[in-house]
Amino acid sequence: MSEFGGLSIALSSLQAQQRALEIAANNVANASTTGYTRQAADMTTLGNATPAIFSTSSGDGDGVQVSAVTRFRDAFLEIQAGFQHGSLASLDQTNGTMTQVQNLFGEPSSTGIGAQISNLWSAFDSVANNPGDAGTRSVLLQQASMLASTINSAAGSLQQLGTSETSQLSALVAQVNTTSASLAKVNQAIQSGSVAGLDVNTLEDQRDTLAQTLAQLTGATIQEGSNNQVTVSLGGLNLVAENQSQSLSLDTSGSSAVLRATQGGFALNVTSGQAGGMLNDINTVLPGYLSKLDGVANTLRDQVNNVMSPISGTIAAGATDQSAAGTLQFGLALDGGASTTVSVAGADWSGAGGAAALQTSLQTALDTAIGAGNATATVTTNGDGSLSVAIAPTGTHALQVQASGANAGFATLLGSTPVGTDGIGGRAFFTGTNASNFAVSALVAGNPSAVAAGVAGNGSLDGSVALELGDMATSNSGADATYSTMIQQLGMDAKDVQTRDNVQQQSVQSLDAARNSQAGVNTDEEMTNMVEYQKAYEASAKFVTTLDSMLDTLINMVGP
């Protein structure tokens, strides 16, 4: 090796050590940068040139070079990270929703639905103890109205949670589409850079970050392909493949929300990621608890109404064709025969003497409708002014009612669960078909005298009906049990999701620790490497100084 060859070797060392120092400095600078992967300089020996014919070579080499910059990344760990983070995001989402549902009901509580149902039975008990007192009846109506309002509010809050999550899911879909398009562009840049022989490590960091984001949002799977590009798949759809991306859309037009591929419109089965958690909340969790709350409301309605106005026989109410205002129109089917429509006009159920007038009109209409049939229908006026309709022989009969105007109250009398109120029959205490429209009947609300405290005909001081309802407080069935079962199920479901969420968090933490141990920056290690590169740089510089001194001596020796 000539002296000038030594200078060339020293120069290559200076350049290589300087490059290694720059890489180490970049690692330290990005130690806290999300998605950054630790890099290191790969140094290789520069082989000496092939000697010419009849010449020799020492074979010592011609120095050093940085042949590549390596990213410390495990592709298998990245794939596992996408899967595990997607599962965690789904559980986090549902766990948060379950917490909101629990907070919504707020049980146990002195003001919750459970306590208010108990207060309702206590209010009935107070009416039973003093049935003639309008004040206790007013308190009962206030308690019933408060309970109905609380049930309505809970139902509305559950529906609002679903609406809110649907809006969030729509925004998430837009984020997925933007991220997919960005990843496709990065894939293209990586391919172009790799072909050109450029350093694409920074682009690969961006690629991995975008791919992990898609996995966390949707539960998509990640697969690395050729030229360091990735393919991201979701439910049979390639969200991203090389430099192409597909967009998603949220479809809420059906009974369930579903994600669809914008191109082709086919539905995607998304069960993981934040989107999977949201879809589970929107389609299953929230509707499930709303249905359970509907069951509580309907059970309470029937529990109270059935006690207030027991009725024998099988008279079922249903709508018929609309009739003119002030006209009662109903159909009567006896012993399986054809239904006959009967109209009673001009009878005002709401006014004084209305029951008697309606009795006459209804009896005449029924007799005409039955004609020569093998059944009879008898309308009688009770001592308290209410009407009774008796159909004989017993069997399955259908009495359909359509009422309007002043006669609207009569429809309740002939309903499937009509009520007696101090002998004034035909008024349901609770109405509604679900938790959203559950309410105190308009015929009772604001009218304490309409509260059925006793059996029709026993007088206004009979409190037997209210007493029976008050005793519901010790019942092991009914609305109390239905609501208690719902709250217990809510607690178990929430605990189950929370437990699975905690276990998944531990799995993700272990996986992330393994990823960070390989790809993360250890500043102590980098500082040690920098000292090593610096010393090597100083040694190379010292070598240059030594060669310079040797050349100077040699030149002076052979000089004039």
Residue ranges and their predicted role:
Residues 1-560:
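S/T-rich, low-complexity, solvent-exposed segments of bacterial secretion/appendage proteins
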